[in-house]
């Protein structure tokens, strides 16, 4: 939860959701979440209601947020009949707009680790939803007041 220039850690949302199908071995390796960890997880409907209560009407800040919103919207559509209506803020787009380029075609590396490194933000444990949210919040706070770069030599 971001308020002003602070990340409020006492207001976090972190739950496990019972999967509706078998978890792929690759997913277990990446996320370090085993089937036994999910045995006491919430059913998807309960998890969605709790998530919506936590989010409220606030904007959602994320890294490649369209993917997350698409997954959440699949369930909000199923359970309450609408897609997730919240405004979204994409930190990779914020970062991109701050990078000075010598041409409109110059490559800007938008990998999460690259953004963290270039903004001098510590990398916490990866593929952990809470750590990812904290790092994404730090990126947002670092960039929210940065003026977009004049991107090319054609720009005044």
Name each model feature, range by range.
Residues 117-118, 137-156:
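Acidic two-metal-ion nuclease catalytic site recognized across multiple nuclease folds
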Residues 1-78, 82, 109-112, 117-127:
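Conserved non-catalytic scaffold segment of RNase H-like nuclease domains
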Residues 82-89:
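Short hydrophobic/aromatic-enriched beta-strand-loop microsegments
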Residues 128-139:
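Acidic, divalent-metal-coordinating active-site segment for phosphoryl/phosphodiester hydrolysis
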Residues 94-97, 115, 139:
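Generic recognition of well-ordered alpha-helical segments
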Residues 89-107:
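Short alpha-helix plus adjacent loop in nuclease-associated cores
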Residues 68, 90, 132:
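Acidic active-site catalytic centers that drive phospho-/nucleotidyl reactions
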